[in-house]
Swiss-Prot record:
GO terms for molecular function: ATP binding; UMP kinase activity. UMP binds at G52, D73, T134, G135, N136, P137, F138, F139, T140, T141. It catalyses: UMP + ATP = UDP + ADP. Pathway: Pyrimidine metabolism; CTP biosynthesis via de novo pathway; UDP from UMP (UMPK route): step 1/1. Its EC number is 2.7.4.22. Allosterically activated by GTP. Inhibited by UTP. This is Uridylate kinase. Belongs to the UMP kinase family. ATP binds at K10, F11, S12, G13, G53, R57, T161, Y167, D170. It comes from the Bacteria.
Length: 237
């Protein structure tokens, strides 16, 4: 690795749930914590954003017509705080110095997000987990992750998924799906290419933030990316 990198890693809440589809699987939590620890041990400055879909999604909560979408999204933000606390505990278990910063004030649980403070934590080698999305309804955690990556001047954002990268079609449905090692932001915005939501991609494009998509369940992938090996994944730039 030529220089010290600053990377933001985004993964979904569903990833924490494992096969059960709900809640937090301690085995997966330990695995992710170890992968993040390996990055820290390389000298990489690491930020994290976790979704909340393993607990609740704002859109789903509002689908019944009783809960307003804004309230549903606030519930989703709280779910990301739950996941952030779990990840903090897992990282601390492995002696990683970590802070949680929330877009919504909740001082009894974690810090409130302040850009300068987040950067200082990163410079001191602490992992920073950004929770509660952007703090606003109608914005996804993908958009929140992209925003935080730009704010902390990250070199890239890694979207850690269950597949090896971006495909020209859904690899779970089509055996002939082809992995795209490199694509432009405009190509990523096409309807059949699912990288992130359009707002997140447009934000990354406007700020020249590379998006790397990889399989989070293959040990060592994050470290390879930090060491500039992108042969096994996809990059949007």
């Amino acid at each position: 690795m030529d220089k010290k990198k600053r990377i933001l890693v985004k993964f979904s809440g569903e990833a924490l749930a494992g096969d059960s589809g709900f809640g937090i699987d301690s085995t997966i939590l330990k695995f992710i914590a170890n992968e993040i620890k390996s990055l820290v041990d390389m000298g990489v400055e690491v930020g994290i954003v976790i979704g909340g879909g393993n607990i609740i999604r704002g859109v789903s909560a509002a689908a019944g017509g009783i809960i307003k979408r804004t309230s549903g999204d606030h519930m989703g933000m709280l779910a990301t705080v739950i996941n952030a606390i779990a990840m903090r505990e897992a990282l601390e278990f492995y002696d990683v110095d970590v802070r949680v910063q929330s877009a919504i004030k909740m001082e009894a649980i974690c810090e409130t997000f302040i850009i300068g403070r987040a950067k200082r934590h990163l410079e001191k080698g602490r992992v920073v987990i950004f929770a509660a999305g952007t703090g606003n309804p109608f914005f996804t955690t993908d958009t929140a992750a992209t925003l935080r990556a730009i704010e902390i001047e990250s070199d890239m954002i890694i979207k850690a998924t269950k597949v090896n990268g971006v495909y020209d079609k859904d690899p779970n449905k089509f055996e002939e799906a082809v992995l795209l090692n490199s694509l432009t932001y405009d190509e990523a915005l096409k309807d059949n290419i699912k990288v992130m939501d359009d707002t997140a991609i447009a934000l990354a494009k406007d700020n020249h933030l590379p998006i790397v998509v990889c399989n989070m369940f293959k040990s060592g992938n994050l470290c390879k990316i930090a060491d500039d090996d992108l042969s096994f994944c996809s990059i949007v730039k």
